[in-house]
Amino acid sequence: QHGIEIMFDMVFNHTSTTHEWFRKALAGDKEYQDYYIIRDPKEDGSLPTNWSSKFGGEAWAPFGDTGKYYLHLFDVTQADLNWRNPKVREELQKVVNFWLEKGIKGFRFDVLNLIGKDVALVDSEGSNEKSLYTDRPIVHEYIRELNQASFGTLEDIITVGEMSSTTVENGILYSNPDRNELSMIFSFHHLKVDYKDGEKWTDQPFDFLELKRILNEWQAGMSDGNGWNALFWNNHDQPRANSRFGDPERYPFETASMLAQTIHLLRGTPYIYQGEEIGMTNPDYDDISSYRDIESHNAYRELKLAGLTHQEAMRIIKQKSRDNSRTPMQWDSSRHAGF
């Protein structure tokens, strides 16, 4: 009636460890064991690789009592899928087609550029770990295959890929219409300008000049290569932009207006996250028990182990926690509920 369509968030890099496929794999079904990335330990009994989980700790967990390990780049309850298995890709194509038949008009694919793990997984050396599983060349083949088997058969479907640590060059490949991959991509470099030496869980003011440089690099580069940006400040994994990049205490209207104008006047498609339209800010919880985000709890524990006081650790958690964007609408008992 109002011309509003629905976009679904598709998590195709991993499944829950309570998923039917993983349960069958644990029960000994070898067909479903090949749906996941399961490896023997090294000869010395150590983990298959020295990779780290993005949520802290190791990226491998015991696969039942088999003596093997399964890969989880994220939480231990999120087992990475083996996209090199054609059956896995066919299953995921069916999922997309199921929702297309229901009338869904858009898909946001979670961490899609991480699906191309190599057959032979090797240890990382220094800072090269992400390159071992990010933007591997075969990812483009997988996306084109998914495109041609599902959403690419229709003309009015929007797709956006969440691309972790990608490059402008790959962003163009993912989103140039001639490539038959995706409509656009989310990149996150502009949201790392308050990371110290690339580390998220640090107390670091954002670098305005670096932010400006990154926005310009992606605007110019994607335009030159006929790629397409998804423009955003906020999502379910980020702190509130008003608190992060502005001064919502003294200049709430100016802060929200400045940030909105930035993404609405650039080349690309703007995305608005719930609460952004009313200028929501970070909550101000003083205790880690008020947070539910597993990444925040892991970070708090590691910060304390590194010697920080509770107050110092909480200052960082307050700034960087994903729960900043996951709180309810901030209303009160005043006129118009405070809006």
What would you call each of these model-derived segments?
Residues 1-339:
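Active-site and adjacent substrate-binding regions of carbohydrate-active enzymes
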